[in-house]
Amino acid sequence: MGQKIHAFMFPWFAFGHMTPYLHLGNKLAEKGHRVTFLLPKKAQKQLEHQNLFPHGIVFHPLVIPHVDGLPAGAETASDIPISLVKFLSIAMDLTRDQIEAAIGALRPDLILFDLAHWVPEMAKALKVKSMLYNVMSATSIAHDLVPGGELGVAPPGYPSSKALYREHDAHALLTFSGFYKRFYHRFTTGLMNCDFISIRTCEEIEGKFCDYIESQYKKKVLLTGPMLPEPDKSKPLEDQWSHWLSGFGQGSVVFCALGSQTILEKNQFQELCLGIELTGLPFLVAVKPPKGANTIHEALPEGFEERVKGRGIVWGEWVQQPSWQPLILAHPSVGCFVSHCGFGSMWESLMSDCQIVFIPVLNDQVLTTRVMTEELEVSVEVQREETGWFSKENLSGAIMSLMDQDSEIGNQVRRNHSKLKETLASPGLLTGYTDKFVDTLENLVNEQGYIS
């Protein structure tokens, strides 16, 4: 056993990144290592309750500089629409002096980062090791190693003919296009210059994509597993929702959640509501109000609330509380999960007993959906038109292809999902990834002689 290390963590300013970083920080602290977590001041309040080792993990709040185009007070991705993410990335770059000062004062042995591509250069100058820890899918990294390829055509050496973009995915690529070139530069620069690469995944899901990344960058790729938090048994699902769900039959309720960054156009939001209504099943939808609307209520289709009264609810107040999602998925009445296939939601769906329907919105979500739907065959994807629009009929059809007891597709998907979940839930598998990662990291840092 080597010396204990002091690790800095500096993730992208989005809760979908900061949260798994903190879960990994908890694992490091559990093993006796020290963690300094660099994050925006406002984010600290929302993450403090997930710090299980406050004596081992110290939050280091950052002042987010003013940037023209970034709304006053915005410090995380959930504070802004996707179109403004580029300004948040500029603000992150402007914290460089604060990061450098913290490293100089606290002398860590290692800094983990993802989108701050300048970290390796700075860390090297200060004799600190750097690790790019990617919390999104390995598939999206592997695919984008060769940019600018033809849609539907695998890049050279890419290990899949299924996890690809297609013509009707242009909406997802265009949605993020303003940030995409910057993102690609950031990520590839970080991958090339860092000392170590680690990814929040496991071989059972993305092994061949991790091998491809390793072969391209000639660096060992360490896997942490999904970094799912331990269930907080002290905070069960609120009684009003538990009782409401319990009023329906086992496995009959459709739960839909599209993440804190997804804001649909009003007409697409209404089509989502109508599509779920069309199934005839009880449902619970947790989404943000659509563009141009202040509340969910004002944007609902005409007559919708009256038609679904007693069997359906569309709610807009949970999207900032992702810890509720696994509690809902675990309720025995919930039988189907409609999701955007964010990487955290993907793992939560896999570890549930629900049938899984994906409506990917952003580029990495599209590729992860293809792995789940076409490689592993544990879910279905809602088909979109060339414009990116999905119809109520396609949404309803996707849900019912899984929820109809006589559906051959539904039964096959359920068997595949059950088998994969059994593998992932086998004793020690996922915790083994984390334990191995921590031990390997400790050895790597000690071997390099940078322990302070």
From Swiss-Prot:
One of the Pfam families matching this protein, by short name: UDPGT
Gene3D superfamilies per UniProt: Glycogen Phosphorylase B
GO MF, one example: UDP-glucosyltransferase activity
InterPro entries, per the entry: UDP-glycosyltransf_plant, UDP_glucos_trans
CDD domains: GT1_Gtf-like
Keyword entries, A-Z: Glycosyltransferase, Transferase
Binding site residues for UDP-alpha-D-glucose: 260, 319-325, 340-348, 362-365
E.C. number: 2.4.1.-
Xref: PANTHER family: ANTHOCYANIDIN 3-O-GLUCOSIDE 2'''-O-XYLOSYLTRANSFERASE-RELATED (PTHR48049:SF176), GLYCOSYLTRANSFERASE (PTHR48049)
Family membership: Belongs to the UDP-glycosyltransferase family.
Protein name: UDP-glycosyltransferase 79B11
Gene coding for it: UGT79B11
